[in-house]
């Protein structure tokens, strides 16, 4: 078994917005461990467009689509996913609600 956790597949939302949502011992998350049963804060990275709900956590506000967002509360990530219509693909760490896009 590998000491390193595989990266989650990038989250893509119903409206086309996408972002990386990760948590492991080397990233900006709480707790900073691999394979926690649940995380309270996660690292978001490289969103496809600036997202106001994430800006308080942005490492480089002058370039919001080319940076990471540190210690983002899981409820904020869940709110971003909901705002963009839910997930159509991708993975989120335990603790983030994996809100799926509704089928019509």
Feature map (PLM): residue ranges:
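Sequence-level detector for tyrosine residue identity
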Residues: 4, 28, 39, 57, ...
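Low-complexity intrinsically disordered segments
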Residues: 51-104
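Amphipathic, interaction-prone secondary-structure segments
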Residues: 2-37
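Generic structural hydrophobic/aromatic packing signal, biased to beta-strands
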Residues: 11, 21, 44-46, 77, ...
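Short secondary-structure subsegments characteristic of cysteine-rich extracellular domains
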Residues: 32-55
